């Protein structure tokens, strides 16, 4: 790994990965490829002389080919995607165009380029679909996505895997829990609740608020991706998951405690999603076999730190109605 292209590198998970790699390796050139969408920010990246920004769309075949050849890219780490489930119900075609077609463009450019050592594709645990309270999803489990976002991620995975089987393109796929941490645009649950509390607004609870998610810190994800890139087996898929399951109401309670306000006074119940998976639960023994361990285990402590971070840094995001 000498010249690495990180798609979506101005976004949430992408920027955390860029900052991790930049601080850990002093001999890696990082090319941040990003369209600069509403949820991205140049302030998310800790820039230095080894990190360079290329503004572009992953559907732009010519620009991707030029970037690969001009910078002698040996590794692609593909984070770029539309990822907000609520938006996928409203504009599903845009999700297909970027998440499926955009990924296909990257793969075809990689095949034609012919010098790539690794194409890493970040996916989500949502591709497994909803499971009950006793089940877990392994890497070989059936994919059964239930919303347009998850369906596009599953579709992209199938194309990625086909390029490994058909063209021997060196690929690795990872599926991740719900990620939280710095640099996340406040449309997702945790930063949205934090910013609402900071602005004195109600916390909007979809449905009953009883749906559950496992939350993993972005720093743990960056470390896991780094490990998989360097030690993972080509052609394999790895779950990146933890046991840190909380309901939406649990998260609201923790954040209200941090803000020093009464939970019941802050809640406003709104209609649920068209389909809202109750829970996901993935195994992590495969990635643990590579030596990965979760480091950010104290969820409440991390949320206190994150609350303070958004107090100072939410200005970088154009949040409607924010003070």
Curated annotation (Swiss-Prot):
Recorded family membership: Belongs to the NAD(P)-dependent epimerase/dehydratase family. dTDP-glucose dehydratase subfamily.
InterPro entries cross-referenced by the UniProt entry: dTDP_Gluc_deHydtase (IPR005888), NAD(P)-bd_dom (IPR016040), NAD(P)-bd_dom_sf (IPR036291)
List of residues binding substrate: 124
EC number(s) reported in the record: 4.2.1.46
Gene Ontology BP annotations: nucleotide-sugar metabolic process
Organism of this sequence: Acanthamoeba polyphaga mimivirus
Secretion signal, residue range per the UniProt entry: none
Enzyme class (EC, first level): lyase
Key word Transcription regulation present: no
One Pfam family, short name: GDP_Man_Dehyd
UniProt entry keywords in alphabetical sequence: Lyase, NAD
Essential cofactor(s): NAD(+)
Molecular functions per Gene Ontology: dTDP-glucose 4,6-dehydratase activity
Catalytic function, reaction form: dTDP-alpha-D-glucose = dTDP-4-dehydro-6-deoxy-alpha-D-glucose + H2O
Residues annotated as catalytic: 125-126, 149
Identification of the protein by name: Putative dTDP-D-glucose 4,6-dehydratase
